[in-house]
Amino acid sequence: MNLKPLADRVIVKPAPAEEKTKGGLFIPDTGKEKPQYGEVVAVGPGKVADNGQLLDMQVTVGKKVLYGKYSGTEVNVEGEDYLIMRESDIFAILD
């Protein structure tokens, strides 16, 4: 991937959607819910504060994160799906 996010943006590779229910039934594509977690694959340099100071990013590449259902912008690069979102759209880091 050759994407480099700007400012306080983060690129996330969403986790794959569930294929089956707990009971073993296959879920059709129209019934699948989008996952709300994924892995950070790139981060921008940070946000510039009003006083001109660069604020460091709190997330780093490789971290698993939890984000909102409608967070980010979906993009497809080289056949792979990604989300580009602001760091503030991330709710938590999963350990």
From Swiss-Prot:
HAMAP family: CH10 (MF_00580)
Gene Ontology, cellular component aspect: cytoplasm
Signal sequence region: none
PANTHER family: 10 KDA HEAT SHOCK PROTEIN (PTHR10772), CO-CHAPERONIN GROES (PTHR10772:SF58)
Gene that encodes the chain: groES
Protein name: Co-chaperonin GroES
Pfam name, any one: Cpn10
SUPFAM superfamilies: GroES-like
Domain of life: Bacteria
UniProt-annotated location(s): Cytoplasm
Biological function: Together with the chaperonin GroEL, plays an essential role in assisting protein folding. The GroEL-GroES system forms a nano-cage that allows encapsulation of the non-native substrate proteins and provides a physical environment optimized to promote and accelerate protein folding. GroES binds to the apical surface of the GroEL ring, thereby capping the opening of the GroEL channel.
Keywords (A to Z) from UniProt: Chaperone, Cytoplasm
Matching SMART domains: Cpn10 (SM00883)
Similarity comment: family membership: Belongs to the GroES chaperonin family.
